[in-house]
């Protein structure tokens, strides 16, 4: 899920023993957790799969009693922890498959800026940060200022954004990437946003400092400072506010410091 840690999953099998993955989560009326949204996303994911992108094949979507269910192909592998340079190299190449020339009527930039200035449905929440601590309030003020200073039309629409492209949504067997999962947040947008997400979360995955700097340089070569600042502000708000709601104060303080560190770089 785009807001993180919000879904459940189990492996199921049919009468013939064919195994699939069943995911489900509580719907809350948000823009990203409806049956209609999932049905809009699946053609986007299938478009990627047609290019060789290792996302799971979608089998079924259903809803019942405020729960949303997704049945999909079970892919091999486990999240790569530690995240190694060989994994990052493959993920950067897979990210190229997300590139395409397709307009969205300004939807991507408006959506991204809105998450900064007012928040989103169920994630990027402002109140938890404002109430958490002076450090949380300071980060929120910084994020809002970035959102207000960002021209939505200037944020590139260059293909498809997975929108939750961190190492725990990657599967690998040894050095080889075998899958990209949790694609329910995919949307027309900027594939480079996903590389910012990967970078922002890469220290948690154990990627070394030198390798993080290499990925950062790649991003600086591809996008201007204003775009990277907006993307990092989104990730800072998203992870810090989620932590303020769901984690202890020490964990939240760590995310707050991590966020300020990355924002200071742009």
Model regions: which residues?
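ATP-binding glycine-rich phosphate-binding loop
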Residues: 1-14
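Conserved hydrophobic "DFG−1" position in protein kinase catalytic cores
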Residues: 11-13, 24, 60, 71-76, ...
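Glycine-centered tight beta-turn/hairpin loop motif at sheet-sheet or coil-to-beta transitions
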Residues: 15-17, 176
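A conserved alpha-helical element in kinase catalytic cores
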Residues: 19-65, 78-94
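A cross-family kinase active-site recognition segment
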Residues: 56-70, 74-138, 145, 152-158, ...
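Active-site Asp-x-Gly
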Residues: 158-161, 171-215
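Conserved catalytic-loop position in the HRD/HxD motif
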Residues: 164
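Active-site activation/catalytic loop segments of kinase-like enzymes and analogous catalytic loops
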Residues: 193-223, 233-249, 260
